[in-house]
Amino acid sequence: MDRIHLTTQLAVQGDVFRAMLSGLTPDQFRWKPAPEKWCALEIICHLYDEEREDFRARLKSVLETPELPFVKIDPPAWVSERKYMTQDFEGILKRFLTERESSVTWLSGLKDPPWSNAYLHPKVGPVNCDLLLTNRVAHDLHHIRQLNNLRYGYLTSISTVPMDYAGTW
């Protein structure tokens, strides 16, 4: 496992989120392709919460106290409980990027951590550090794809011309 590469990817993907989300208008960051789908505002709120309360917290837990159970989280419930749609888009984006930088700094500063540690999850079995770090990178990629689809969907929703010249989506 190339943990340096994965940590670098987290930094790079933070820059990707910054580039994809900076400068969006309220119409753009609130646009949804369907009522049950997430908009960019909900995605960045989710990423902010996940950065602090899921991946980083759980990786820290497995590294330091693998025998203790994970703190329970409920990301789907957070959307309404934390009123994602009422959040300040630019503010939450800035807070997410600050948290991401903190995560990268923390990971980069670890000195000989016990990467072989694993928490024995009662439902999914062993959850080790490499699984958490790799899935953090994969989670970013999932939401980058989701944001790309949102941006394309928004463009097609406001366009008066066909999009097939650009290629098949």
Regions found by a protein language model. Name each.
Residues R3-I4, V16-L21, K32-E36, P76-E81, ...:
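Short amphipathic alpha-helical segments, especially helix-boundary/capping motifs
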Residues M1-Q28, E50-S61:
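Alpha-helical bundle segments that constitute or directly flank the non-heme di-iron/ferroxidase center
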Residues Q9, Q13, M20, A77-S116, ...:
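Acidic/histidine-rich alpha-helical segments that form the ligand environment
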Residues S22-F29, S108-S116, Y152-T156:
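Surface-exposed helix-capping loop/turn segments at secondary-structure junctions
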Residues L6-Q9, L21-G23, P66-P69, V79-M85, ...:
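Short acidic/polar alpha-helix capping motifs at helix-coil junctions
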